[in-house]
């Protein structure tokens, strides 16, 4: 999985300054915004859903564990529930960069203290400088120190570390390894102020790839380790080791408390040090690799230990460097604090047939891998894996031996053994955190029981949301995970939409036929069609024979209210329309690349578009678009949304250009005067006594960032979040629930899907699901028999015009392709003859 591509695009969009138009149309008066109490939570996807580059155990307090996300903030482990608690949800849109956590340090002297190095990108995608976040109550509250440089929580090399370290003898002192040639920094006042360690000789030289903006910066100083035995409590530690991303000299040491530094003599060269751990026996263990990760692990790797007492370097690589089997970086590194000779290391993206997790109980003299070869293609596994907490982790696919599914993971940049419990281990992957509670069974010939250890972490980059008027309350399109049908907001879904996709980028449904949906996506395989259709609310999907012209996939999609046409706007291509579920396509007349398109939610013939500063309407199902000549429009638009039940009512979210509405199909627009910024707009069930749907936006009103609701068509607004619930980047999608007043769903870039409901003692009911009956039961008697086959035949031959059931298409479209024809008749006949065990559509 190519993780976080979507978040990089997000950052580029976020950084763009949208110029507000200087002349506005007739203003809609808005009163000063007030706040109403809401309760907020995640729509559970489960399993994490993203890359968590690091896990940090406190060395002096049991069960005090932190995890850091590359775009989703930081978490603390709750041992009473065995779930993770998010710690940075208070950051709003303007501080989205702080959800990129570069490093975490938990204080071994005062466990209440915890520090975070925050900052997502070192390039120009986001304006924020890096920051040190300081807490004296385990992350319940934070103070902030702005650094004079940027950090890169979502940059190459982010699983190396930890870059931030606390002196175990004098916890006033912290060291920070930086990027971009900024070197090593130090604080002597609990992280409040910082100064550069001018005597440190090497800020790093390694650059992943100088040809691209995302990869052109120096990776820098990547980890700091203190030798606690070199001093006494209350006095600064004298001996400090620092790892630098430099293939010539990468390990440095100070023996005078950081005053002077020298490269450690005799060290290996030609590789990068991913992690360094100093064991109680004086051995400094280090994992090395050709590259910094986390996406690739190409090349070779090594594992070394340095005897800090004798100065001897010992190569303990599990697979000899000269072997052709040594084809990946060694990244993750763990040492058992109960026994310094027990160490574990991981491969970085070996991929085939799976990752490698090595364990040694004799200081690296011998190793065991968590699997070994049997009679090819069989492998002998020393583990079992349980993904019941996030069943979608099987990716909906089956593997051929020697590969199996689910895999051990990928991007395993960190592995940790609990310092208080030698049986507990956790490691990171590109999609979740795995772990076990019986690690030492492996040493006795037993199997390690690996399971998902990411409950509470929701780290997806969510790209689109719909809440249809029937069926599941929510259906999503998700970066890297494609997307899901969310039947229960508090229980994670079992499967993703289309396993052959890599990311879902857009989704829509037909307002008058809400079971019909279209999904557009990215895919790594060339022959996969990057649009799919569903006739059962997203539970089953089929791909058409053809794609839109010049499509590379992705982009957005708009479905006609009557389901008779679909417009796909692929990434870097012009919008195109299909009226036959993708059998044929026609480029929409008068629109081009970059157009924003939406459908009217009443009239199936109408679509709307914003393109090159002009507003367009189509009245022929999307074939032809005409400039409405609407005056005084914003210069650009992020989202267009039309109002269900109100033909011609169109709203534009124009970021800094504000919020606009039209009631005549886009021929004229009005700008809401006191909505300063509107990133996205959506609609939900109308308030009691109102005939206009509730309107939801993320943006800024009266110079206050937040989420807002209007119950009176935009005349007045209330803020529905508070300063503790900002969730960072919330400019991708928002929708109210058409069945539950007050409920709103918001897509975030790194904190999954969040939803809010009015705070009250009475729970907001989840709408009952409509039982549409059995597929194949055409007469509604809850049985599938020869009577249904006869009805099917008569219907296909047009002897009858309608079937006895309420939803003909649901019951008779046996294979889910959106049509009722002889193919469905054949499937039903085979099923009744027991030639097939089940029908294709569930």
UniProtKB/Swiss-Prot annotation:
Gene Ontology, cellular component aspect: cellulosome
EC id: 3.2.1.-
A Gene Ontology biological process term: xyloglucan catabolic process
All residue ranges annotated as the Dockerin domain in the record: 771-841
Function text: Hydrolyzes the glucosidic bonds of unbranched Glc residues in tamarind seed xyloglucan, producing XXXG, XLXG, XXLG and XLLG. Has low activity on carboxymethylcellulose, lichenan,hydroxyethylcellulose and glucuronoxylan, and no activity on xylan, polygalaturonic acid, wheat arabinoxylan, rhamnogalacturan, curdlan, laminarin, galactomannan, galactan, arabinan and pachyman or amorphous cellulose.
Family to which the UniProt record says this protein belongs: Belongs to the glycosyl hydrolase 74 family.
Protein name: Xyloglucanase Xgh74A
Gene that encodes the chain: xghA
